[in-house]
A protein has these predicted regions:
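Non-heme Fe(II)-dependent double-stranded beta-helix
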Residues: 1-12, 19-104
Length: 104
């Protein structure tokens, strides 16, 4: 959980960096799933409903700029948005009335 000093910093500056906010197991899961999407993007030549590709993307050198709505593409992304390691600090800063509209 956040300290009073962190909450004060957020209120004064509008942002907060929380070191090691994600447990290593969750971070590793996100990295593995993202690597799978990067690998799959080798077979995609242009932006589509899933992939936003970099201009220099190629089959030989896949360059994935972002996944569109990742929480709908894989349960790992969905799960992290609902995990207490994210929701706990966010609710401390913004309150409990939270809603996810979309993701990038």
């Amino acid at each position: 959980m956040l300290t009073e000093k962190q909450i004060k910093f957020y209120k004064e500056n509008g942002y907060l960096l929380v070191e090691n906010a994600l447990p290593s197991k969750i971070l590793k899961g996100l990295q593995d799933v993202t690597d799978e999407f990067v690998e799959a993007s080798r077979n995609v030549a242009e932006n589509d409903e899933t992939y936003d590709l970099s201009d220099d993307h190629s089959k030989e050198n896949p360059r994935l700029r972002r996944l569109k709505q990742p929480h709908l593409l894989h349960k790992t992304y969905e799960d992290v948005t609902l995990d207490e390691c994210i929701l706990g600090p966010v609710s401390q800063l913004l309150g409990n009335n939270l809603r996810r509209d979309h993701t990038k």
